[in-house]
Amino acid sequence: MLECVEEINESKRFRAYFSDGTITKFGQTNPKKGTFIDHQNKELKKNYIKRHLKDLETNDYTRAGYLSLFLLWNKPTLKDSMNDFNRRLKYNDFNIKY
């Protein structure tokens, strides 16, 4: 992934750009309880991941489900999550612990 930027006046919260030209919009614009990068609540993180593990069945890391799980619900900051996501891309390692 080359870049992830916050959307302005859009239906989704972020936009991810990939080196192959793929652009994916993802994340609710105004989630009621926020995401892990907003609140760092480990119990909410665990519950989110359990509910959304099925999103990984596509094996397509450019899909919104992958991006939400690995960028918004993985590490405490978007920057840390992006670094982790890029490491996972490099090693094709998309196993997640919760």
Residue ranges of predicted features:
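Arg/Lys-rich, low-complexity, intrinsically disordered basic segments
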Residues: 1-98
